Structures are given as structure tokens and as C-alpha cells.
């Protein structure tokens, strides 16, 4: 059974920083590109970041580029999202995805 468990969320003031984690299990983590997406208070789904299977390549929409950093630890089956210079429009529920 594939499981993706996010942690690290919370309330942050504008301009603040936050790091999210995602613990993956039930599949060979290192074989997959991984993603962060978010659901806004208006229930709109937005893509936030993508990282390649080996972690060498990362992709972001312009809305978060330069502020968010996706990374991964294939030895620990963990995915991360470092968010900085947070804005009110970043308010959302964040999810990792395979």
C-alpha cells in the first residue's frame, strides 16, 4: 500500500519560513519523480514543485520560484519542501504526490 504522510505544517506570519516533510512507503521511492501540490481555501489545486527521481532536477511555477525549494532523501524515503518569504497567497493545504 502506497503511503505518503506529510508533516511540518503550521501557522506562519507573512515573510516567515516553514519546512514540510513527506514520509513515503509502499513503493520504491527512488524510482519516482515526486511532487508537491496545494489546495487553496477556494479548493483550487495548484502545482508547487517537482523533483526528479535522483534529485538532480527540480521544477517550479513562477509563483514560488526563488522562494520554495524541493528536495529529497532517497536513503530515508523522505521528500521535503522548504518555503521562505511566505505570502498570504501561499495559504493552503500542502500535499506530496507521486
Curated annotation (Swiss-Prot):
Keyword match Metal-binding: no
GO CC annotation: extracellular region; immunoglobulin complex
Alphabetic keyword roster: Adaptive immunity, Immunity, Immunoglobulin
SMART domains reported in the protein's UniProt record: IGv (SM00406)
Domain Ig-like residues, every copy: 1-98
InterPro entries: Ig-like_dom, Ig-like_dom_sf, Ig-like_fold, Ig_V-set, IgHV
GO biological process: immunoglobulin mediated immune response
GO molecular function terms attached to this record: antigen binding
Note: This sequence belongs to the VH7183 subfamily.
PANTHER family: IMMUNOGLOBULIN HEAVY CHAIN
UniProt-recorded name of the protein: Ig heavy chain V region 6.96
Gene source species: Mus musculus
Amino acid at each position: 500500500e502506497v503511503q505518503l504522510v506529510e508533516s511540518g505544517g503550521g501557522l506562519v506570519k507573512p515573510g516567515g519560513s516553514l519546512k514540510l516533510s513527506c514520509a513515503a512507503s509502499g513503493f520504491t521511492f527512488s524510482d519516482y519523480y515526486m511532487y508537491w501540490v496545494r489546495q487553496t481555501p477556494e479548493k483550487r489545486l495548484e502545482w508547487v514543485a517537482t523533483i526528479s527521481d535522483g534529485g538532480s532536477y527540480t521544477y517550479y511555477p513562477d509563483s514560488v520560484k526563488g522562494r520554495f525549494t524541493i528536495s529529497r532523501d532517497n536513503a530515508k524515503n523522505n521528500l521535503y519542501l522548504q518555503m521562505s518569504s511566505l505570502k498570504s497567497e501561499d495559504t493552503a493545504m500542502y500535499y506530496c504526490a507521486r
